């Protein structure tokens, strides 16, 4: 017992998950588009397009919601990786080749897509939400499924969820191929949970 008193203990990598959820809950409306997500996507402007060398280029203007300061993981870079993933794809539509391009805007009213990261529960096993074709994209940063307390997903999981949800925002549906990013199911990994 005397040895325990003298023992110095520290945690090399403390789990910031609880601090993150507190940051999001302090100013709930600012960090969440919950009310806007209930509205119809028809209120968003349509993406624009042009045809270059017989390829339809569809332009999406994206508003990126602020995040609480000093989050432990970088999610904005995962969004940029998700943009790049879809911009590298070529689609067939109406017997024409099509590509997408994303442009970030600071003005919500100009955006076809609003992106935000959330910590609220959006349904059992639901990792994200997106309107089809235009509208809101919400990506959860964690859940309560690892050890019963809120735990953050790792960066790769958040990127995978974001890429999937952005796929919906450019009008892609779920597919049956389990190796496709648009497959309906995904099991995320945790950044800090000791039980994962």
Predicted regions and their residues:
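A short, flexible beta-alpha/helix-coil linker loop
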Residues: 65-69, 144-148, 188-189
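Short, intrinsically disordered, charge-balanced linker/junction segments flanking boundaries
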Residues: 1-2, 194-196
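Disordered inhibitory propeptide/activation segment of secreted metzincin zinc metalloprotease zymogens
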Residues: 2-73, 87
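Post-HEXXH active-site segment of zinc metalloproteases
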Residues: 173-195
């Amino acid at each position: 017992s005397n040895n325990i008193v003298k023992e110095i203990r520290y945690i090399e990598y403390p789990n910031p998950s609880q601090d993150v959820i507190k940051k999001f809950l302090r100013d709930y409306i600012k960090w969440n588009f919950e009310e806007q997500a209930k509205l119809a996507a028809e209120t968003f402007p349509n993406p624009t397009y042009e045809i270059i060398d017989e390829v339809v280029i569809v332009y999406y203007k994206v508003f990126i919601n602020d995040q609480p300061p000093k989050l432990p993981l970088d999610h904005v870079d995962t969004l940029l990786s998700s943009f790049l993933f879809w911009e590298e794809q070529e689609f067939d539509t109406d017997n024409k080749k099509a590509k997408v391009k994303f442009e970030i805007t600071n003005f919500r009213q100009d955006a076809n897509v609003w992106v935000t990261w959330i910590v609220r529960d959006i349904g059992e096993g639901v990792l994200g939400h997106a309107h089809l074709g235009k509208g809101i994209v919400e990506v959860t940063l964690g859940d309560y499924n690892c050890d019963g307390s809120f735990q953050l997903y790792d960066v790769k999981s958040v990127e995978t969820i974001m890429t999937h949800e952005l796929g919906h925002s450019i009008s892609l549906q779920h597919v049956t191929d389990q190796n496709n990013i648009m497959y309906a199911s995904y099991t995320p990994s945790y950044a800090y949970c000791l039980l994962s």
